[in-house]
Amino acid sequence: MKAVAGEDGTLKPGYEAAPLRTVDPAKRMKENRMEPIPYTGDKGYKLGDVLDKKVTMEEFVAQLSDDDLICMFRGEGMCSPKVTPGTAAAFGGLTPELQEFGIPASCCTDGPSGLRFDCGTKAFSMPNGTLLGCTFDLPLVEDLYEMAGREMRQNRVDALLGPGMNIHRNPLNGRNFEYISEDPYLTGWISAV
């Protein structure tokens, strides 16, 4: 539905066809699928060796078993003792085997309205995604997340879960307060800062 000028100049409801997807997502995924990295077993490489350019990331990852990869990405739930207390989840180097490879444990916290801790730690509360979208103020949003980044660093938090980029009024969504707007253009711009 959109506004259309009538013969007398007043606006009336009008309609236009909704755009249809022109990309086949399954085809695109198949075309961009990476080749599997063959398993080599432990060659003695550490994650720091990738940073020092002694080995490639592919050579490093080739040492990890399927179980290692599953443990790294499955992670642990709320309030893991291996990371900052009260955070939403831990992931990465949570097992002794992964730690031997030099992979650190990392954590994330819920963040649609700032950092959240479940242990009594105080944190700055930010406007949720919808309110940020209502400002149309990119420099303001950038300043807010600059501050959130500092707070994350101070509290040893590696990732912030939110705000979200789903579009309001999409039938697949479920957490509208986290989303920035029903306008995909505005959502993209606010998210990019």
Residue ranges and their predicted role:
Residues M1-V193:
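Glycoside hydrolase catalytic-domain context in secreted enzymes
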